[in-house]
Each structure stands twice: as C-alpha cells, then as structure tokens.
Curated annotation (Swiss-Prot):
Keywords, in A-Z order: Isomerase, tRNA processing
Chain residues that bind substrate: 111
Family stated for the protein in its record: Belongs to the tRNA pseudouridine synthase TruA family.
Catalytic activity field: uridine(38/39/40) in tRNA = pseudouridine(38/39/40) in tRNA
Record-linked PANTHER family: PSEUDOURIDYLATE SYNTHASE, TRNA PSEUDOURIDINE SYNTHASE-LIKE 1
Identification of the protein by name: tRNA pseudouridine synthase A
Domain of life: Archaea
Role description: Formation of pseudouridine at positions 38, 39 and 40 in the anticodon stem and loop of transfer RNAs.
Annotated InterPro entries: PsdUridine_synth_cat_dom_sf, PsdUridine_synth_TruA, PsdUridine_synth_TruA_a/b_dom, PsdUridine_synth_TruA_C, TruA/RsuA/RluB/E/F_N
Entry keyword Transmembrane: no
Gene3D superfamilies recorded: Pseudouridine synthase I, catalytic domain, C-terminal subdomain, Pseudouridine synthase I, catalytic domain, N-terminal subdomain
Residues of the active site: 55
Disulfide bond annotation, renumbered to this chain: none
Length: 269
C-alpha cells in the first residue's frame, strides 16, 4: 500500500528538511522513525517522495511525504510520532494511488511569512504584489540550484497586518530555491520606500536586468500546505494534533519568558 502523511515541524530545530550527512534534518529523524517501526526498510525501496525541500530554519504545517509500506496499520500519525522528536509531528494520513508522487503530483503550494510590522506602507506592498501574479521568469528571485527553468506561476499573494505583525501569503504552482523569501524582501523594500514598482517590473525581466537581493530570514517562513487537485481522503489524528498543541504551548510560554528576560536585560539601568 502507498501511504501519504502530513507533517508539521519547527524548522529552527533542524538544518533543513532534506537529509544531509552529519547534521540534524527532518528527513533524518523521519527515516529513523519509519525504520525503527519497520514501516519501511529504506527510502529508496519504499519509493519515498516529499512535496518540497525546506531550508534550515523554515517551518512546515502541511509538508507531505509518501511511501510504500507493507505495514499500513503502523503508518499512522500517533504511532510514527512515538519515534519522532517533539519538534516534528505527523497529524494526518491517507491511502494514495501507487503512482502518487508527493512532489510531482502537487498542483500548488501555499507559503506563509510572518515579520515584524515596522512602518511598511501596506497599500504599496499590495499593489506591488499584483505585479507578481501570473507567469513570470523569477530568476532574480532565486538562488541558483541547477533548475532547468526559472519560470513559475503565482496564483495568489495576500499582504495583511495583524497588530504589530505583517503577514504575507504566497500560493503558486512551484517555487525556486529562496524564491518566497526573496519575494518577501522585495515587497518589504517597496513597503518602506527603498524601491518602487518600476524596479519590481525590471526584476521580472532577468534577460535585461539582473540584481541579487538577500532572502528574508528563514525563521519567518512556513510551508502551510500542498494542494493535489484530487480527492485525497485525509484522516486527521485528533490525538496527535492535541498533543502537539500541548507541547507547543509550553514552547510558546518559554519564548514569552525569554522575550521578557531580554527586555529587562536591554532596559536595565
């Protein structure tokens, strides 16, 4: 049977999602868990696929992986989570066709970026975001990774303010390395008046205009979900979702305490 899982993880705990030698990654922990439970023998023999690689520091709520297994009764979130560290958790699973590929079968991906509000002109950022919609060559918004084509299609970009936080949602068919984070940088530069829409249009014409821009920090980015455009019957695991919520509430409290400590340190007279 072929099984797909929805995974969430806290990216700042790992050196990216893709397995690498000598460093902690999401896949390293996932493969270890699946082998320990005898769900798979190896990623290759199980025809393992992943919806998309995330860089070090980037989080996920709806990462999708798929693999073949002879023990589908064990390939469920609450069992797999028993072998995973708290910073990674599976929360839904589904039986999928034998040909399902978590990456190639994807129709679109949704990324969400969170950053401090500052004094951005949100109306300018929203107007600029409209220029990015549709199909463009995003070479100036990527880090070279041997891609055959740098043409991508963006379906939706939404910029909104939530208190002191600015949030940007980006939905597209697929994304280049660092593409979302560089889009965030570009919109931020327009929002604070450093650049304008004419510059953004130039950036979308890499055959004539080339400029490298720094990607926004990875810790603000989350892969929210992957759309497959077909009727996958996901079964959510309420226990796993509830347990992850409890564990991460403790993490939130620790961060709040640490923020208060830092405030006191820098304001001490």
């Amino acid at each position: 049977m072929r099984v797909a899982l929805k995974l969430a993880y806290i990216g700042t705990e790992f050196h990216g999602s893709q397995i690498q030698p000598n460093v902690e990654t999401v896949e390293k922990e996932l493969f270890k868990a699946l082998r320990n439970l005898s769900i798979i023998e190896s990623p290759k023999s199980a025809d393992y696929t992943c919806a998309g690689r995330t860089d070090a520091g980037v989080h996920a709520l709806g990462q999708v992986v798929a693999f073949d297994t002879e023990k589908p009764n064990l390939a469920i979130p609450r069992v797999i989570n028993s072998e995973l560290p708290p910073a990674i958790w599976a929360w839904a699973h589904a039986e999928v066709p034998y040909y399902f590929d978590a990456r190639r079968s994807a129709v679109s991906r949704h990324y969400h970026y969170v950053m401090s509000g500052e004094d951005y002109d949100i109306s300018k950022m929203r107007e600029a975001s409209k220029l990015l919609l549709g199909t463009h060559d995003f070479e100036n918004f990527s880090r070279s990774n041997g891609e055959k084509s740098t043409v991508r299609t963006l379906e939706r970009i939404n910029v909104r303010v939530d208190g002191e936080i600015t949030k940007i949602d980006v939905v597209g068919n697929s994304f280049l390395w660092n593409m979302v984070r560089k889009i965030v940088t570009a919109l931020s530069m327009i929002g604070n008046g450093v650049r304008d829409n004419d510059w953004l249009l130039q950036m979308l014409n890499p055959e004539i205009y080339e400029e490298g821009i720094e990607p926004a920090p990875p810790y603000g980015l989350t892969l929210m979900g992957v759309n497959y455009g077909e009727n996958i019957e996901w079964i959510e695991d309420d226990y796993s979702i509830r347990r992850a919520g409890e564990q991460n509430h403790k993490r939130i409290l620790r961060h709040r305490v640490m923020a208060e400590v830092l405030e006191e340190l820098i304001s001490h007279e």
